[in-house]
Curated annotation (Swiss-Prot):
Its main location: membrane. It comes from Treponema pallidum (strain Nichols). GO terms for cellular component: plasma membrane. The gene is tpp17. This is 17 kDa lipoprotein. Keywords: Cell membrane, Lipoprotein, Membrane, Palmitate, Signal. The keyword Cell membrane applies. A lipid is attached at residue 22 (N-palmitoyl cysteine). InterPro entries: Cu-R_lipoprotein_NlpE. It is found in: Cell membrane. It is a lipid-anchor. The lineage of its organism: Bacteria, Pseudomonadati, Spirochaetota, Spirochaetia, Spirochaetales. Disulfide bonds: none annotated.
Amino acid sequence: MKGSVRALCAFLGVGALGSALCVSCTTVCPHAGKAKAEKVECALKGGIFRGTLPAADCPGIDTTVTFNADGTAQKVELALEKKSAPSPLTYRGTWMVREDGIVELSLVSSEQSKAPHEKELYELIDSNSVRYMGAPGAGKPSKEMAPFYVLKKTKK
């Protein structure tokens, strides 16, 4: 099992350190036996994904999501060309991979630390990109809109 996970991590370009993290995650991950969940988890660990998501009241929202290897996450949003929201909003929380391979983030705004956690879903497209799917139950973006909801992996 560990050899196949190493091979998968190598295929995804995770590297030796990431491969070691992936192998170790399979021993504690509740979805360790699920190949799709393992693939998603290996691709996301330590990854930073960025893009501009559509918005109704501005040209877009510059979005950066960080999936830390310890299961914590951070999301930073900045509304483009919007004078009423000039500073970025920062959310912190946790992430997990569901059995179906969908990534679920549980986030709370740093300004509202006592507020309930917001849940967001992401779909792994390939080892270098994820698609924002919104809140649970919202459904995937339409085929025409799907390309506008993609975040690409960045180096830092």
